[in-house]
Amino acid sequence: MYSINRLLSITIGNNRSYFDVQYVNIAMLVWGCVFCLIAGVGMILSKNFDRRKRLWMILLQFATAVLLLSDATACIFRGWTGIFGYWIVRISNFIVFLDNNIILYLFHRYVCSFIFTEQEERTLKRATFINILCAVAVALVIISQFTDLYYYYDAQNVYHRSEGFIISIFIPVTGMMVEMSFLIEYRKKLSNITISSLGSYIILPIVAAIIQFYFYEISLIDIAICNSMIVMYITVIGEQNRKLDNLEQKQIKTEAELEISMVLNQCIAELTTEADINI
């Protein structure tokens, strides 16, 4: 039975600095996964949300949790030889690439839930473009499993990028730019804090993708996606609390006005009665 230190040592080799980087990477991925699971469950238990927004937020959190767990698993078992190591590394990396595109689609639906009705969403050309783009991206991930389009493995079962890896980055970035066009065009329908939180999913992963071309050891893109999910979750909870507070204040105001109205009616009734008696 391997201890966790022994497991990580086998996975990342004997280089101490590389070990430290990978240990931090795995820890961030696992804790990010835990947070997204908690956020997803929290949204399930919360009932005071718009139905569409709540659905897509739940799916986004769980999809991100799967992404982070798969990436952590791929890191832990990198370099394992044998049947188990062979399959676990391949399945994990496949899910990572596949899930990135699924999350883009879910994010698109989440953005649309803020701006459009379901009927309006179906008629948008850009929405159709995103749907097609995500379908093509998923198809390419499947094809890459047989052609080494995005990545390949050496004899030690270690993952390496292929020349076509840039395609796996270009497709999501294209989709994110389309989503940014929605946020800019329909910004008057959104609060500033909502625009900022939704924009974090676009800006953070793009910045992370640029950095990751030069800093290969940490899963910066996936961590950036996780951070954006944290921002979106905190924002949606804050916005909902603000709306509930406004409703509570309106209810208090309405009750006060009703009480004043009842007192006035009672006073008028008493004055009318006294006038009738005097007559």
Model feature map: region roles:
Residues 5, 182-250:
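Interfacial "cap-and-anchor" motif at the non-cytosolic start of specific transmembrane alpha-helices
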Residues 253-279:
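PAS/LOV and related PAS-like sensory modules
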Residues 10-18, 78-90, 152-157:
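Membrane-interface interhelical loops and short amphipathic "cap" helices
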Residues 44-58, 112-126, 183-194:
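Membrane-interface helix-boundary motifs at transmembrane edges
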Residues 23-34, 90-101, 160-173, 222-230:
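Alpha-helical transmembrane segments of polytopic membrane proteins
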Residues 2-6, 28-110, 128-146, 198-213:
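Hydrophobic alpha-helical transmembrane segments of multi-pass membrane proteins
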Residues 106-109, 115-174:
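Membrane-proximal helix-loop-helix units in multi-pass membrane proteins
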Residues 13, 17-49, 58, 168-183:
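First transmembrane helix
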